[in-house]
A protein has these predicted regions:
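Short beta-strands and strand-loop turn motifs
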Residues: 7, 105-107, 169
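A conserved beta-strand/loop element that lines the FAD pocket in flavoprotein oxidoreductases
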Residues: 1-11
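Hydrophobic/aromatic beta-strand patches that form the interior of the parallel beta-sheet core
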Residues: 5, 39, 167-169
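Generic secondary-structure signature for well-ordered alpha-helical cores
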Residues: 2, 131-135, 192-196
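Beta-strand segments within the central parallel beta-sheet cores of soluble alpha/beta enzyme folds
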Residues: 7, 140-142, 200-204
């Protein structure tokens, strides 16, 4: 079976030859438990946890912005596209969320763990929507900002760590929902001994 610990902070991780001890706090109550194996899949918090386990994982937060546009009238609903769009020049992507919502996302910002929403980052998303879909009412947009866990090479950290029993499934950047399920299955197979996860070969660069 499985047990979910909601609203729990991981305070300390310690690797031992016979397993990993995890000290965590829930509602002010601290407990320490031992596990045979540990998978780090903590998004932008993965770097801190990895350092406790003897690994250097260079995952950093890259802030992205989105607006969710309520499609509250017939004109907006009929004008917003149902297929996802990618504007490569503007670096903007869209997703239709059912009948009544339209999401527009883009930008990348290096600003530590700050999640404040800047008006100058939101405005280009609103302007882009108004220019391309003038019939969509953008007066009630809901802005949002989130932190993408990114590696410098844009590749996720998947597979075993330096020490036995330590595994990683993190750093998927803006493709977390797209990739993390498949890489989780790969890590599970590796933990069972059914698969060896190896690094992707580096591309060869040639100049003429």
């Amino acid at each position: 079976g499985v047990r979910f610990n909601w609203d729990t902070d991981v305070d300390q991780l310690k690797w031992h030859a016979d397993g990993i001890t995890v000290t965590s706090s829930t509602n002010g109550e601290q407990v320490t438990e031992r596990f045979d194996a540990f998978v780090v899949c903590a998004g932008v918090g993965s770097r801190r946890l990895a350092s406790m386990l003897g690994d250097r994982v260079n995952i950093y937060p890259v802030k992205g912005y989105s607006i969710t546009v309520p499609l509250g009238d017939a004109a907006s609903q009929s004008s917003a596209p149902w297929v996802s769009l990618l504007d490569d020049d503007a670096k903007i992507v869209t997703s239709r969320l059912g009948q009544a919502r339209f999401r527009v996302a883009g930008t990348a910002e290096f600003n530590g763990f700050n999640r404040d929403i800047r008006a100058d980052r939101v405005k280009p998303l609103v302007d882009w929507t108004r220019n391309l879909f003038p019939e969509v009412d953008t007066s009630a947009c809901v802005p949002w900002a989130g932190l993408r866990p990114m590696n410098p090479n844009m590749m996720p950290k998947v597979g075993a760590g330096r020490r036995p029993g330590v595994y990683y499934n993190t750093g998927h950047g803006h493709l977390g929902w797209t990739l993390s399920g498949a890489t989780a299955a790969m890590v599970a197979e590796q933990m069972r001994g059914d698969r060896v996860v190896t690094a992707m070969p580096r591309p060869r660069l040639s100049f003429s």
